[in-house]
Every structure is written in structure tokens, then in C-alpha cells.
């Protein structure tokens, strides 16, 4: 850098990052670009001090095969920050997950153990086991117990956001996370539990 700064900070012994890393962004491209896309989302990230993002696969269509992943890599050329993309796990694509280890631009595998936006739910234990057995990258998990969610759905009050953490409470997350940790250990694979309930 050629510019002189007005102020100097002593960072000896500290870890210094040029910006923060957001490991879970939903820029919704392709599919729902009326709300945001890779270009606008990455601009907003940079303006907020985020210099690297990992984008989620629950788009339309979802990023669950090499064709859609390649399209997303191409779309990523319009982004303004460092980026990588998650490859979505399904009950059907588990054999593909073995082939991701050296896939350029892939930061990991996203598993939705509880229902969320999109149709990537993998909630049956044998399907979750197949995902972990064949995973060649870290598996990032939306960790909620779908059966408990179904039982608690009656607690939702339409229009009342305060019922969201009542419906999707700590036990919903803990039950699923216990199962995920057990499966990950059995297959000696890495799991990253996302947005935990506190």
C-alpha cells in the first residue's frame, strides 16, 4: 500500500482480519432475485465490513448437482467479495457428495435436518447417515428435529413473530444436534451446527 495512514495500531500478537467472514448468507440467486442477488448481496456485505461469504444452496433451483453448482460459480463472477458456495444434500444425491473434496468454490455440504425455505429437507436418520458416510467436506447443518417441529406447529400464532422461538425451541435444536453429533462421530466426519437456538 502506498497511502500513509493517519493512525497506526499495534497488532503484535493479535489475529488481524481485513473484514469479517459470514459463513451463512442467503442471496437467493437463482430464483428469488426480487429480494436480493449475488451482486447486490455481496455489495451489502462489503459495505457492512464482511469481506468473505459462504452462500447457501436453497435457491430455485437448488444447488444440489454439478450443473447447478457450475451455474452458481458463473453467477459468482458478479460478486464484490470473496465467496464460496455450499452444495445442498438431498436424500438422493449422497453418492455425489463423495466427489466434492476438490471442487473449486465449494465450502461444504449443507444439510437441512429441519424444514426451512426450499425443499432440501433430509430428516430421516438413514438418509442423514448416508450424507455423512459419503461426505467429502464439512457438513453444515440446519439442526432442528422435524418430528418435534411438526408436533409443535400448533404453537404458531399467525402474524406473531414472538411465537417463532416458542415453536422452534431449544429442545427442537438439541434433539437434532445430539443425533447429528452421534452420526458425525460414527462416520468420523466434521459437522458444523448453524444458527443454534440459545
Positions of PLM-derived features:
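A generic structural signal for alpha->beta connector loops
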Residues: 5, 50, 80-82, 105, ...
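Metal-associated gating/positioning segment near the N- to mid-region
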Residues: 11-78
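Conserved beta-strand scaffold positions in the cores of enzyme catalytic domains, especially
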Residues: 6-10
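Histidine/acidic residue-rich metal-binding segments in metalloenzymes
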Residues: 95-198
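Hydrophobic faces of well-ordered beta-strands that scaffold small-molecule active sites
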Residues: 19-25, 53-55, 83-87, 107-111, ...
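Conserved short loop/turn motifs at secondary-structure junctions
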Residues: 57-62, 89, 193-196
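N-terminal metal-binding scaffold of metallo-dependent hydrolase/deaminase domains
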Residues: 1-3
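A glycine-rich helix N-cap at a beta->alpha junction
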Residues: 74-89
Amino acid at each position: 500500500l502506498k497511502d500513509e495512514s493517519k493512525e497506526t495500531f499495534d497488532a503484535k500478537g493479535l489475529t488481524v482480519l481485513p473484514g469479517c467472514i459470514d459463513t451463512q448468507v442467503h442471496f437467493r440467486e437463482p430464483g428469488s432475485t426480487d429480494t436480493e442477488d449475488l451482486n447486490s448481496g455481496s455489495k451489502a456485505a462489503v459495505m457492512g465490513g464482511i469481506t468473505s461469504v459462504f452462500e447457501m444452496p436453497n435457491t430455485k433451483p437448488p444447488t444440489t448437482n454439478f450443473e447447478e453448482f457450475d451455474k452458481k460459480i458463473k453467477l459468482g463472477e458478479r460478486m464484490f467479495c470473496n465467496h464460496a458456495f455450499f452444495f445442498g444434500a438431498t436424500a438422493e444425491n449422497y453418492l455425489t457428495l463423495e466427489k466434492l473434496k476438490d471442487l473449486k468454490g465449494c465450502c461444504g455440504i449443507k444439510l437441512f435436518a429441519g424444514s426451512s425455505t426450499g425443499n432440501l429437507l433430509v430428516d430421516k436418520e438413514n438418509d442423514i447417515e448416508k450424507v455423512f458416510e459419503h461426505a467429502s467436506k464439512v457438513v453444515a447443518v440446519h439442526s432442528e428435529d422435524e418430528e418435534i417441529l411438526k408436533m409443535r406447529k400448533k404453537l404458531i400464532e399467525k402474524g406473531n413473530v414472538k411465537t417463532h422461538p416458542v415453536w422452534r425451541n431449544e429442545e427442537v435444536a438439541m434433539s437434532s444436534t445430539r443425533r447429528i453429533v452421534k452420526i458425525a462421530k460414527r462416520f468420523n466426519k466434521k459437522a458444523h451446527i448453524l444458527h443454534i437456538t440459545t
